[in-house]
Amino acid sequence: MIAAGLSPVMLAACAPTVIPAGRTVTSPHLTKTAYVAADGTVLPLAVWPAEGPEKAVLLGLHGFGDYRDGFEDPAKIWSKDGITTYCYDQRGFGASPTRGRWAGIDTLVEDAITVANLVRAKHPGVPFYLIGESMGGAEALAAVDRGLQADGLILSAPALRGRVVVGPLASGALWFFGHTVPWLPSGPTSIDFRPTDNPKALKKLQNDPLWLHQTRVDMAYGLVEAMDAGYDAAKRVHLPYLMLHGMGDRLVPTSTVRTAIEIMPPRADSKLAFYEHGYHLLMRDKQGPVVAADIAAWIGNHEAELPSGADAEHSEPKLAALWGTKR
């Protein structure tokens, strides 16, 4: 009723702020510390080179509020396994120039595809994998669906709670606030939901100036846009994939994982892993090294059992049963 009383002009004036990529001014390229996009935007980049012979290369897409350092701990472990890891601050996050503003899923996905192409060109002949955490998982699915080339996909607590999952009431409320008061703080952040059981990691996040501690409603509205794209793309995933879920995750609940499993195509070279004591930020958890080791093992052999035994067949019974019907 309230929305019906607002004129189209008023709604347009209060539309969510989106800052997509601008016109092309340069050829996209990587430096030692940044990804320079075609529109000249400089996005900070972190690289953790493999120690010894390089067996694989990973490109990480971080989650909502996070930035490139979100992959620091696992990347150091993967480095010892011969895996090089790249991660850049996505537009709107970390030290990006448009921090706190949504870039739009099309721009975010195009960045991911471009960086993937640049990374693959720097490592010819080396197996290339895409890993996305939370929001990054949704973006990774969308990017693969739109042509990103990779040898496999790793989804850590993928955020797939789009409109189909949350329902019309919640999504309608978010649309209303996003189009009337887009500047309004969106409320509790992921830190308020205890995203990890690791007190040192949690304290670091709380004091990290590059973590996005407060977001606008229109950023949350954009996140739903990304989750919608990821959910839709999940139906058509055509790569080997490893999906990881912590049973203590308060941001991506088990029901969301079940919904995702129901629509993802069955593949003998893919795995679902449940961590009984895992939270949302699995790779920052106390058992983060265990999760990182599982990822490295899967990259080495898609069909072998994971070292931790977290494979769905050996963990949460109800979801394992559902997963079994998809094999």
State where each predicted segment sits.
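The serine-hydrolase catalytic nucleophile loop
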Residues: F64-K76
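Catalytic nucleophile-loop/oxyanion-hole region of alpha/beta-hydrolase
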Residues: G65-R68, F93-P127
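An N-terminal hydrophobic leader/cap segment in hydrolases
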Residues: G5-A37, T41-A50, L319-R327
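Alpha/beta-hydrolase-fold enzymes
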Residues: E133-R216
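Short beta-strand/loop motif that positions the catalytic acidic residue
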Residues: V237, M243-H245, D249
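Catalytic active-site module of serine/aspartate enzymes centered on a nucleophile-bearing elbow/loop
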Residues: K271-R327
